[in-house]
Swiss-Prot record:
It comes from the Bacteria. HAMAP family: Ribosomal_bL33 (MF_00294). GO terms for cellular component: cytosolic large ribosomal subunit. The gene is rpmG. Pfam families: Ribosomal_L33. The keyword Membrane does not apply. PROSITE patterns: RIBOSOMAL_L33 (PS00582). It comes from Hydrogenovibrio crunogenus (strain DSM 25203 / XCL-2) (Thiomicrospira crunogena). GO terms for molecular function: structural constituent of ribosome. Keywords: Ribonucleoprotein, Ribosomal protein. The keyword Metal-binding does not apply. Belongs to the bacterial ribosomal protein bL33 family. GO terms for biological process: translation. This is Large ribosomal subunit protein bL33.
Length: 50
C-alpha cells in the first residue's frame, strides 16, 4: 500500500510531497534533495501530511 508523505526541509520551510510503500520502507524516510529557497542540496525528512 502506498501512502502519501511530506518531505520537509531541515533548513527551511520548503517541502515536497511524494508517496512511499510502507511494506518495503519501514521507518522514517530521509533523503538529500534540492531546496530552491536556499538554492542548495539539504536533508529532507519525512513528516505527516495534515
Amino acid at each position: 500500500m502506498r501512502d502519501k508523505i511530506k518531505l520537509q526541509s531541515t533548513e527551511s520551510a520548503y517541502f515536497y510531497t511524494t508517496d512511499k510503500n510502507k511494506r518495503n520502507m519501514a521507518g522514517k524516510f530521509e533523503i538529500k534533495k534540492y531546496d530552491p529557497v536556499l538554492r542548495k542540496h539539504v536533508l529532507f525528512k519525512e513528516a505527516k501530511i495534515k
